[in-house]
């Protein structure tokens, strides 16, 4: 609790002043990526990389960025690939000339955090989960899709941290911003960012509307936590709340229901086969995702893809066998 109070004091001090790289996509040609801007509320924007260039994210290169603009300075959610920082800054400058003061990370992966150091060097204060900082400070582990993690750079590490039971509330630019930690879901250090007045929640990668769920168990993610995070999202969101995933199009609360039901359906089938003594290979051969493959965009991705059906089912099997 002491660390939480210190974190809150640092945040408040920084706010007072403001008022007075998942691993880089293999084979990605960053020179071909454009940063696209979508206005989602009066002073809230979503920045996205253009589609079809990043092999790891065909729908849009890298992760989504949130930008809250106003006289108190720019508040950013996530930082994209480091190679795209200049393009991201150029897109922000078309929105506002105010300094970039705050940056919060939804989770560990380099497509959301690799640009951290660049923005910190511009003067941004970096906030994230204590668990995320711990993950980023450890020697790199490969992510669950086999990509190497980005090399550790101390400048990428959060300065202000908060724990699972210590949500942070910021007030700036006429908005109330809630940093809401969730249990180990996509990774072990996930955060949802809610903009109360705009009725927008940025939910990171524990939901995606392209491919099957990607739960990075190498970096603390868990199937149980992902389901809990989806439940938490449905509790927080109203019928008109805009939910911004780390990848894919903006959704609403109703879109979470079939996604969660799909996970529960696959989980139940895999659990049944485990009880029958089936091996992982036998479960994969049974094609337990077949009822969903035609409904999930990208549901028929090749087996090697990070969000393919086979990788998802393998993760579910391993989590259930491990009792998690």
Which stretches of residues belong to each language-model region?
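N-terminal export leaders
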Residues: 1, 5-9
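Bacterial N-terminal signal peptides
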Residues: 8-18
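Accessory terminal helices/loops
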Residues: 12, 21-25, 235-240, 249-324
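Conserved beta-strand hairpin/beta-sheet module of binuclear metal-dependent hydrolase folds
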Residues: 39-92, 191-195, 199-203
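Active-site HxH/HxHxD metal-binding segment of metal-dependent hydrolases
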Residues: 44, 90-171, 188
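Acidic/histidine-rich helix-loop elements
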Residues: 48-63, 136-144, 148-150, 210-223
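Active-site metal-binding loops of divalent metal-dependent hydrolases
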Residues: 50-51, 79-80, 108, 124, ...
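Metallo-beta-lactamase
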Residues: 73-75, 81-83, 169, 176, ...
């Amino acid at each position: 609790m002491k660390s939480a109070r210190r974190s809150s004091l640092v945040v408040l001090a920084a706010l007072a002043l403001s008022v007075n790289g998942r691993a880089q996509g293999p084979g990605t040609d960053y020179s071909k990526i454009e940063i696209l801007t979508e206005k989602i509320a009066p002073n809230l924007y979503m920045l996205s990389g253009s589609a079809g260039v990043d092999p790891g994210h065909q729908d849009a290169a890298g992760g989504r960025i949130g930008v809250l603009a106003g006289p108190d300075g720019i508040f950013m959610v996530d930082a994209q690939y480091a190679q795209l920082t200049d393009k991201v800054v150029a897109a922000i400058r078309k929105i506002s000339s105010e300094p970039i003061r705050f940056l919060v990370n939804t989770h560990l992966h380099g497509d959301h955090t690799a640009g951290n150091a660049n923005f910190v060097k511009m003067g941004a204060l970096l906030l994230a989960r204590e668990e995320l900082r711990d993950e980023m400070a450890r020697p790199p582990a490969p992510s669950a899709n086999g990509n190497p993690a980005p090399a550790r750079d101390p400048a990428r590490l959060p300065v202000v941290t908060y724990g699972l039971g210590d949500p942070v509330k910021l007030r700036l630019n006429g908005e109330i911003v809630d940093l809401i930690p969730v249990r180990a879901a996509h990774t072990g250090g996930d955060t949802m960012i809610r903009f109360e007045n705009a009725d927008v929640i940025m939910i990171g990668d524990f939901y995606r509307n392209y491919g099957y769920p990607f739960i990075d168990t190498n970096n603390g993610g868990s199937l149980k936590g992902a389901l809990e995070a989806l439940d938490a999202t449905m509790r927080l969101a109203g019928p008109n709340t805009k939910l911004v995933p780390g990848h894919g199009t903006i959704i609403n609360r109703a879109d979470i229901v079939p996604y969660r039901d799909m996970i529960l359906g696959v989980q139940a089938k895999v659990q049944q086969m485990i009880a029958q003594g089936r091996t992982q290979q036998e479960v994969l051969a049974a094609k337990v995702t077949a009822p969903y493959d035609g409904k999930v965009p990208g549901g028929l991705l090749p087996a090697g893809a990070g969000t393919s059906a086979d990788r998802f089912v393998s993760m579910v099997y391993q989590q259930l066998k491990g009792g998690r």
